[in-house]
Each structure stands twice: as C-alpha cells, then as structure tokens.
C-alpha cells in the first residue's frame, strides 16, 4: 500500500472525528498524523500525552537559523552543545538549556541580518532516541 495514500486516509478519518490507533517507529509519521503519543517499553508506558505537550516538556532546546555567522562561530557560543548544517542551508543548534535562546538571539541580531530564527523543542524522533538510549 502506498504510504501517502495511507496517510491521506488516516488524516481523512481523523478529520471526521474517528479515533485511529497507529503504531510506528518512524516518529516523523507520528508527528504528522497523531494528536497523542504513547511510548511503551516492556509493556510499561514511559511517555504519554499530546504530541505538542510531550515535545515542549523537553524544552525549546533546538534553534534553526539562517545567518551570515559561520557554523564554527555559532558552535562556540555558550550554551550551544552542537551545530549542524542542514540540507536546506539552515543551521540547527542543539542547546544545553532553552534559556540560551535569548542570548543567541541577542548575539545574532546585533547589526546582523537573520533570515531565519526558530526556537523549537526536540522532535519526537530525537526524544524517542533519547528515551531508547536510556532504556526507555
């Protein structure tokens, strides 16, 4: 079955108020299709809730940015754990704490053009990997 056809039908049923139970390890599908998520390990629920709430519980620790500042310089900013160049040209910053978002915004906005600055929580895929690494 074509994945896109299945996704369309799930979203169609969802729009009609149907409850759909969907099991998948591909967290991008889960984010796209599900309102709520449950992660289970050895029969025990280890994470449960609205996908938006679950993501936000982990903090706004990701920043997506387009700027003239080099990735090397971005990686040196206090609070940046890692900087990664994405295929679309944006740079993804992994923060040690959401509070560093203010500092990073201040640094980038001092007389410099910022095409994109988006602070978000980790994706469900990142949360899944983190939880799986902890033995869920």
Residues of each region from the PLM?
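ABC transporter nucleotide-binding domain
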Residues: 8-94
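Short alpha-helix in the ABC/ABC-like ATPase nucleotide-binding domain
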Residues: 1-5, 9
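Short, charged/small-residue-rich alpha-helical element at the C-terminal edge
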Residues: 62-136
């Amino acid at each position: 079955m074509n994945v896109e056809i299945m996704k369309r039908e799930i979203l169609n049923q969802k729009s009609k108020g149907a409850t759909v139970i969907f099991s998948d390890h591909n967290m991008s599908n889960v984010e796209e299709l599900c309102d709520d998520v449950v992660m289970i390990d050895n029969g025990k629920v280890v994470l449960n809730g609205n996908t938006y709430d679950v993501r936000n519980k982990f903090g706004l620790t990701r920043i997506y940015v387009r700027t003239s500042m080099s990735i090397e310089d971005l990686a040196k900013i206090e609070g940046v754990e890692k900087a990664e160049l994405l295929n679309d040209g944006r740079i993804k910053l992994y923060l040690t704490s959401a509070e560093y978002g203010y500092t990073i915004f201040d640094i980038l906005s001092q007389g410099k053009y910022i095409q994109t600055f988006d602070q978000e929580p980790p994706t469900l895929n990142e949360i899944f990997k983190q939880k799986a690494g902890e033995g869920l």
